[in-house]
Amino acid sequence: MSLAVVYSRASLGVAAPQVTVEVHLSNGLPAFNMVGLPETSVKESRDRVRSALLNGNFEFPSKHITVNLAPADLPKEGGRFDLAIAIGILAASKQIPAKYLLDHEFLGELALTGEIRPVLGVLPAVLACRDAGRTLLVPRENGPEASLIQDAEVRTAHQLLAVTAWLAGQYELPLPDPQTTDTLPEVPDLQDVIGQSQAKRALEIAAAGSHNLLFIGPPGTGKSMLASRLPGILPPLSEQEAQQTAAIHSIGGLTPRAGHWHHRPYRTPHHSASAVALVGGGSHPRPGEISLAHNGVLFLDELPEFERKVLDSLREPLETGHITISRAARQVDFPARFQLVGAMNPSPCGHYGDGQTRSSPDQILRYLGKLSGPFLDRFDLTVEVPLLPKGSLTGKAERGESSQQIRERVLGAREQMLSRNGKLNNLLDSREIEEICRLSPQDAEFLENAIQKLGLSIRAWHRILRVSRTIADLAGRQAIEKEHLIEALGYRAMDRLLSRLRSG
């Protein structure tokens, strides 16, 4: 027959929708037409496919060739459909058997020599193909990435000739080579940080409840060092989380590595990063730093040095856990459930309240004014990281507990949250907070007075209750007590700083 149907996969956010490649050969003047909303890069595949077939000693049909990429309303980009188009032409012209095509999917860009080149976003295609119950053929260079999904049927090839021989039953294509398991680098330990017991305690609370955390302090007090220790006290990714995180990295051009498969991502963009770099975008939308940090930690150092509009673009993803990028032709949705950790100096000169301040209160307020109130409201804990007292470095320094000891408490608290809430405390909505974070009348009155004194919002009320619930979980308590509220209120360093500046 002069009609062939081949399956492939597009790339749309973290999804890989099926694309049906229909190839029809008809009589008439020789031509090669492509329909189905192909972009320029896809239209260019006509020349690549023709050269690849001729250089592979195949016959290029002297007929009117029509290639339809369905569905027509799905934009197609890149060279990922080259292999499927070439296979369709060969099957329609009866140069290869077509009986096995419907059980397979094909992904890969063709070189003029017939070599199959790697493409981006293979991991989402592997997951989608597994769910569809088909075997996916990918370029050999994409094999190690595809091998991460162990229950998927995947084959790899380096040349078009090998694929055609496999479809004809003359050759067995290899399975993807599994990645060599890398030896994970030693995770930095919290015992490396001298002193700063309150900041370490805040880090433990943040890890247990997945709360957003802001460190405030002069230069050189260990803010960045503390933040880099957070992944070491977090639990590993579940299989589902690991697959979703790796799929995002695959789309972003970051090849997931076997040794880091269940390791939570830790992203540290520079303060000169644009809004597109942070939240994602582009003419062909790609994930930004907040999506690459999905299920992990996003650390923003020197927070006031970021553009205000860049930081404000994080407000919605912090609440919803995803980011929608709208373009004229489509909308793309990327997951962005990350834990935000920020670090900043309390003033332009870096110091405040330690006798080294060179900035006036008005200068400090202007400096802090670079951060909008709604953005600061997204931090559950804001902690002061002061200069170490004299003698801390020369004497016997207080190192505190190891990351492993703290991690065990974090895992226990998370188990308690998941068994009670089915989710972590930072994800509790207002109705769940009323049920799970109930206070006695005396404690409720105490908290309300504290909120009014600090001039905090209703959002801050909810965040304090969530943090108090996490503190109670770490202590193994069933109910929130006044001591937990007092500790949670102690992690409002930014509110106290602003209050002191405005009053004096």
Where do the language-model regions lie?
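P-loop NTPase nucleotide-binding/switch module
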Residues: 168-205, 209, 237-290
